[in-house]
């Protein structure tokens, strides 16, 4: 359900690879990768963040608890904060450092850029395959 982006157009015209790039799973695991990178950088800069907290974040980077995030979003009406909360439920030791000092744009905009970059790489790969494959007239 969350593995692939779903719309009538994507189901008809997009490859499974492209649908996976724009899926909820990709979006929210990228948010978590960005929060891990943020925590690692802040630790390196001297903030009071432990390796144990970072390891806890890494341990739950891929198992998105969609049900908790969805329930929280109904309360707070904010997608990023609902996922911060949901990640904190899974990572109680690291709860206080998730999204520390960041804005919603940190995860939203950077995730969009990462996904667009990967999508363009996929398009480039497919164009190169077309360009290098023999012509039907040959």
What name fits each language-model region?
Residues 1-134:
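A helix-coil-helix interface module used to build multimeric assemblies
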């Amino acid at each position: 359900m969350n593995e692939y982006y779903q719309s009538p157009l994507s189901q008809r015209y997009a490859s499974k690879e492209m649908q996976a790039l724009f899926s909820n799973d990709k979006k929210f695991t990228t948010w978590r990768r960005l929060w891990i990178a943020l925590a690692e950088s802040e630790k390196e800069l001297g903030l009071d963040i432990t390796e144990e907290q970072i390891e806890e974040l890494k341990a739950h980077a891929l198992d998105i608890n969609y049900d908790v995030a969805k329930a929280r979003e109904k309360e707070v009406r904010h997608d990023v904060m609902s996922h911060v909360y949901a990640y904190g439920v899974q990572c109680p030791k690291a709860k206080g450092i998730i999204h520390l000092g960041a804005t919603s744009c940190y995860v939203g905009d950077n995730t969009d850029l990462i996904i667009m970059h990967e999508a363009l790489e996929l398009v480039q790969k497919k164009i190169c395959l077309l360009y290098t494959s023999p012509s039907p007239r040959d």
